[in-house]
Amino acid sequence: GILDSFKQFAKGVGKDLIKGAAQGVLSTMSCKLAKTC
């Protein structure tokens, strides 16, 4: 149903957001360590 497809959509978006946030944190940390930011 509509609710199920919305749940699937929200799950996918959440995963992408978490992935993006993790990558942002990692790149920020690595540039701070390398003093390149």
UniProtKB/Swiss-Prot annotation:
Superkingdom of this protein's organism: Eukaryota
BP GO terms, sorted: defense response to bacterium
Cellular-component GO terms for this entry: extracellular region
InterPro entries cross-referenced by the UniProt entry: Antimicrobial_frog_2
A matching Pfam family: Antimicrobial_2
Places the protein is found: Secreted
UniProt KW keywords: Amphibian defense peptide, Antibiotic, Antimicrobial, Disulfide bond, Secreted
Function: Has antibacterial activity against Gram-positive bacteria.
Family: Belongs to the frog skin active peptide (FSAP) family. Brevinin subfamily.
Protein name, per record: Rugosin-C
Summary of the tissues where the protein is detected: Expressed by the skin glands.
Disulfide pattern: 31-37
